[in-house]
């Protein structure tokens, strides 16, 4: 079964077009494939405002500011799923408002920023982190490989 991306658009600042959804699905598929994971996962993706992501960041991470993306992994081990059962990889929450701001700041397209945030979040869902410098370098290297494969290079 192919990847399932369940979308919940809770913001009104930017219209989310089908082309963007397809790009984000490709980000999931490409990230999973790079890591050698089966593509048959469900990922929940919520588009929110800065205000909502700030509330979530405060609640779940104790950090009272708007961030760009939050990841909530639901999988530790891929061996524990019975045949045919839906595999829930996790939840991704993206502040579309923050993505617009960062695309302008980094002088690249909104689509490139959204693709980066999705790939970044996927690596968190697959167990990567960036608390230590060596972890951050490894995660960044993997993200750049996937983004390049998708054609989302820095402009």
Curated annotation (Swiss-Prot):
One of its GO terms (cellular component) is cytoplasm. It holds the Pfam family YbeY. It comes from the Bacteria. It is an enzyme of class 3 (hydrolase). Its cofactor is Zn(2+). Keywords: Cytoplasm, Endonuclease, Hydrolase, Metal-binding, Nuclease, Ribosome biogenesis, rRNA processing, Zinc. Its main location: cytoplasm. One of its GO terms (biological process) is rRNA processing. Binds 1 zinc ion. The keyword Cytoplasm applies. One of its GO terms (molecular function) is zinc ion binding. Coiled coil: none annotated. Its EC number is 3.1.-.-. Zn(2+) binds at residues 120, 124, 130. It is found in: Cytoplasm. Belongs to the endoribonuclease YbeY family. Single strand-specific metallo-endoribonuclease involved in late-stage 70S ribosome quality control and in maturation of the 3' terminus of the 16S rRNA. This is Endoribonuclease YbeY. The lineage of its organism: Bacteria, Bacillati, Bacillota, Clostridia, Peptostreptococcales.
């Amino acid at each position: 079964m192919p990847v399932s991306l369940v979308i919940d658009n809770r913001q009104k600042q930017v219209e989310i077009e089908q082309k963007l959804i397809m790009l984000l699905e490709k980000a999931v598929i490409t990230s999973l494939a790079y890591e050698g994971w089966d593509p048959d996962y469900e990922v929940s993706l919520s588009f929110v405002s800065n205000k909502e992501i700030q509330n979530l960041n405060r609640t779940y991470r104790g950090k009272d500011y708007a961030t760009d993306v939050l990841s909530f992994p639901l999988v530790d081990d891929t061996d524990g799923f019975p045949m045919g059962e839906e595999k829930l990889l996790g939840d991704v929450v993206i502040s579309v408002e923050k993505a617009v701001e960062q695309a302008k700041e980094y002088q690249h397209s909104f689509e490139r920023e959204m693709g980066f945030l999705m790939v970044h979040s996927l690596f968190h869902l697959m167990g990567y982190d960036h608390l230590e410098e060596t972890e951050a370098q490894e995660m960044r290297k993997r993200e750049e490989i996937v983004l390049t494969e998708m054609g989302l290079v820095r402009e």
